[in-house]
């Protein structure tokens, strides 16, 4: 999971959800535990939910996730990169080696939307709180699913006050998509 903002919240949401589904998961990366802890752990994990910063993506040469997520891109860390284009190129690396998995991309961000349109990315799934044409769309406490089930609506009755706001609705959409890919029940997703 990468993006300028929202990585930690999305990583935690997905990590909590898949653990409730009794999936053995390492949750960390830029958030909490370093990824190296997963490799050194006595317990072997079947899944990894990893928050990746642009700094970590710089070092990736072979990385083939089952699910890649790009939340948003805005001007940040420009002191580290040659220019903004270089920063964007680092963020795009989350998809570079994903040849068989799913690639989740927000349409609410101009840079991500352009990337979604221009790049030939396999198995891409768009999500949005603003664009009704996205594969997965959120509006007025409903998720509209046009990817897994055409015109399917899921009503969300309660959302924690901590998760209000468009950016958090995006995080919820990503968790929903992951729940569908991993065949996690609607009940666990809603909880």
Labelled PLM ranges:
Residues 1-107, 111-122, 176-182:
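Phosphate-binding loop of NTP-binding sites
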Residues 82-85, 92, 117, 121-191:
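Adenine nucleotide phosphate-binding catalytic loops in nucleotide-utilizing enzymes
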């Amino acid at each position: 999971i990468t993006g300028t903002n929202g990585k930690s919240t999305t990583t935690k949401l997905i990590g909590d959800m898949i653990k409730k589904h009794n999936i053995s998961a390492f949750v960390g990366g830029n958030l909490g535990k370093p990824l190296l802890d997963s490799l050194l752990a006595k317990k072997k994990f079947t899944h990894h939910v990893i928050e990746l910063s642009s700094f970590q993506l710089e070092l990736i040469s072979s990385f083939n996730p089952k699910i890649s997520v790009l939340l948003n891109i805005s001007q940040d860390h420009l002191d580290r990169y040659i220019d903004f284009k270089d920063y964007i190129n680092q963020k795009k690396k989350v998809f570079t080696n994903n040849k068989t998995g799913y690639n989740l991309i927000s349409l609410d961000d101009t840079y991500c939307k352009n990337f979604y349109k221009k790049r030939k990315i396999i198995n891409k799934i768009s999500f949005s709180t603003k664009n009704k044409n996205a594969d997965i769309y959120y509006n007025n406490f409903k998720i509209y699913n046009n990817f897994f089930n055409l015109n399917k609506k899921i009503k969300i009755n309660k959302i924690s006050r901590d998760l209000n706001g468009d950016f958090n609705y995006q995080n919820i959409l990503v968790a929903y998509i992951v729940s569908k890919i991993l065949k996690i029940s609607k009940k666990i997703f809603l909880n």
